[in-house]
Amino acid sequence: MSNHIETKCIHGNLDFSWDEPTKAVSFPIYQTATFGHIGLGHSTGFDYTREKNPTRQHLEEILTALEGAYDTTAFSSGMAAVTAVFDLFAPGDHVICSEDLYGGVTRLVNTIGKKNGLMVDFVNTGDLDEIKRVLRPETKALYIETPSNPMMEITDLSACAELAKEHNLLMITDNTFLSPYLQNPIALGADIVIHSASKFLCGHNDTIAGFVCSAKEELAAKIRLIAKTTGGCLSPFDSWLVMRGIKTLAVRMERQQENAGSIARWLTEQKKVRKV
């Protein structure tokens, strides 16, 4: 029996989220750089926090449950997560991106990406014909924000996933603006889901973080290698802050939808407002 999303926000897919062996109800912050070994060549599974940390791992397990992913890697910011995903590509590879993207992503692909030989086209991904128009043999992926930041443009993820599968492309989706509470891109065919956790996931404006949720084992292994090698990992304390924030994700999203509906209804009654 699968857990409801409210339960996953607190426990992930576990029966409980107590720390072993302490049984701490609030998962501890393992604020350490290194971990001792039981004996020579006998690791506990944790060696160095850049590679793996219990607090961060617990948070990653919660995101994996929320997004229905194979695995999740936590990063020090949303842009660190995006950068790790673009590190999957080689010079000469081509990526098709939504024309309306978060400015940091646009800057990344137009500067560092271009310097490293990445080719990018920005199109209206809500129009499949526009995507097909720029397809080329070097195309490796679709990169989609829906709703997009900042113009809230919408893309049909299922339709794009079918197109991506037809052309053997990676389907990458930024799910920051809807969160797992309202949308699960992997269930709609995405291979990779990205989050900037400083928005709805954390919800308290007190930290920044990013996630890459991978649908398949091979992709997950590549992302973890990039994270371990480049070092953009999320700290134990920030992992705990995001974990705390996610506990209230469901109730916050419900109230935010209610508030948005109230504002929209009020605006429709204003004579000076033409369209809502």
Task: Go through the PLM ranges and name each one.
Residues 24-25, 57, 68, 206:
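Short, basic and Ser/Thr-rich N-terminal targeting/leader segments
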Residues 17-18, 72-272:
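Conserved PLP-enzyme active-site core in the AAT-like
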Residues 34-83, 87-88, 104-111:
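Conserved N-terminal alpha-helix of the aminotransferase class I/II PLP-enzyme fold
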Residues 1-53, 59-62:
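N-terminal "arm"/small-domain region of PLP-dependent enzymes with the aminotransferase-like
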Residues 274-276:
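Short beta-strand elements
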